[in-house]
């Protein structure tokens, strides 16, 4: 790799603000706030609003919208049956 053109990649702790879930990962983000991790080391803490622990798609609490309503209206209008 060329020297001096790549961002600093280091380990940080991401914390889901909604659930308090924390995980250690690599990132180029940095923060003034730090936290001591389970291994005893101190890492920068990045707070996120949504993670895999709170996102409805990953938790199984997903709500479906009326996207299929348009198909049902089309089928009803033209007399198609499922």
Curated annotation (Swiss-Prot):
GO MF term set: structural constituent of ribosome
SUPFAM superfamilies for the chain: L28p-like
GO annotation, cellular component aspect: ribonucleoprotein complex; ribosome
Keyword NAD: no
Keyword Ribonucleoprotein attributed: yes
Keyword annotations of the record: Ribonucleoprotein, Ribosomal protein
Entries under InterPro entries matching the protein: Ribosomal_bL28/bL31-like_sf, Ribosomal_bL31, Ribosomal_bL31_B, Ribosomal_bL31_sf
GO BP terms: translation
Superkingdom to which the source organism belongs: Bacteria
Record family assignment: Belongs to the bacterial ribosomal protein bL31 family. Type B subfamily.
Self-association and partners: Part of the 50S ribosomal subunit.
Protein name (Swiss-Prot/TrEMBL): Large ribosomal subunit protein bL31B
Organism: Ligilactobacillus salivarius (strain UCC118)
Gene for this chain: rpmE2
């Amino acid at each position: 790799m060329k020297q001096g053109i790549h961002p600093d990649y280091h380990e940080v702790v991401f914390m889901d603000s909604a659930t308090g879930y924390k995980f250690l990962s690599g990132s180029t983000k940095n923060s003034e706030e730090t936290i001591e991790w389970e291994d005893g080391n101190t890492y920068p803490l990045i707070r996120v609003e949504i993670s895999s622990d709170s996102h409805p798609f990953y938790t199984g609490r997903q709500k479906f919208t009326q996207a299929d309503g348009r198909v049902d209206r089309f089928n009803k209008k033209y007399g198609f049956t499922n």
